[in-house]
Amino acid sequence: MTESHDTPITPDGEARPHRRIKSFVMRAGRMTEGQQRGLDQGGPLYILPLADSPVDYDQVFGRSAPRTLEIGFGMGHSLLEMAAAAPEQDFIGVEVHRPGVGALLNGVLTQGLKNLRVYDCDAIEVLNRCVADNSLDRLMLFFPDPWHKARHHKRRIVQLEFAELVRRKLKPGGVFHMATDWEPYAEYMLEVMSAAPGYRNRAADGTYVPRPEERPITKFERRGERLGHGVWDLKFEKVD
């Protein structure tokens, strides 16, 4: 859900101060014991503060390694699985849903992972303020809110402005990997990314890539497959 540039108008016709639409929608949720443990014990160790200048992630992780950032990891199952399967890589997750952050950190504590850190704030702020240009090997955006209604399309996170922000943060050859289970949104993302300068579609036919093995299948996705629902993956590589 990207920034909106609409200026609300008051009943007397005066413009209100601009309110930026953030990259997320807050949803309430009860905290389980495990999720609370994750926040209480894992938060001080693995949640990174929002910085005012680019972060030296080599220092954060204590090494130089391929680096992936995921926006909106939900309950964290896929990100946790990917980090556990690739200990030679470093992962950064961004999520504002507190139960999801707690669930991921509980898993990090349980598995003893050292290659994963979290931001619990707006992803746009994280990219703009914390992530240096040309520093990410991969950025993942899986199953973002499609904002089905036409009047809400401006809230979709995948826009040309966002694509340019991601391109700046990726290293040359870095990949922006998106996935959605709603075909109209897949078509929309393909249209936006095909028009975004500085990218090359990794799909041989210029559309969607086969489901990559490195992206874990979620329970939601398995249920959708049983019901005949599709999932569309897009991979765009930074070329300059």
UniProtKB/Swiss-Prot annotation:
Show the Pfam families listed in the entry.
Methyltransf_4 (PF02390)
Binding residue positions for S-adenosyl-L-methionine: 70, 95, 122, 145
EC annotation from Swiss-Prot or TrEMBL: 2.1.1.33
Q: Origin, by domain of life?
A: Bacteria
Show the active-site residues.
145
Question: What are the UniProt keywords, alphabetically?
Answer: Methyltransferase, S-adenosyl-L-methionine, Transferase, tRNA processing
InterPro entries assigned: SAM-dependent_MTases_sf, tRNA_(Gua-N-7)_MeTrfase_Trmb, tRNA_methyltr_TrmB_bact
Which reaction(s) does the protein catalyse, per the Swiss-Prot or TrEMBL entry?
guanosine(46) in tRNA + S-adenosyl-L-methionine = N(7)-methylguanosine(46) in tRNA + S-adenosyl-L-homocysteine
Give residues annotated as binding substrate: 149, 181, 218-221
Q: Which GO CC terms are listed, alphabetically? A: tRNA methyltransferase complex
Named in its record, the pathway it takes part in is:
tRNA modification; N(7)-methylguanine-tRNA biosynthesis
Annotated region (Disordered), positions in chain: 1-20
- Keyword rRNA processing in record: no
Membrane-crossing residues?
none
The molecular function GO annotations come to: tRNA (guanine(46)-N7)-methyltransferase activity
Q: Does the keyword NADP apply?
A: no
Job of this protein: Catalyzes the formation of N(7)-methylguanine at position 46 (m7G46) in tRNA.
Which NCBIfam families does the entry link to? tRNA (guanosine(46)-N7)-methyltransferase TrmB
Family stated for the protein in its record = Belongs to the class I-like SAM-binding methyltransferase superfamily. TrmB family.
User: Which protein are we looking at?
Assistant: tRNA (guanine-N(7)-)-methyltransferase
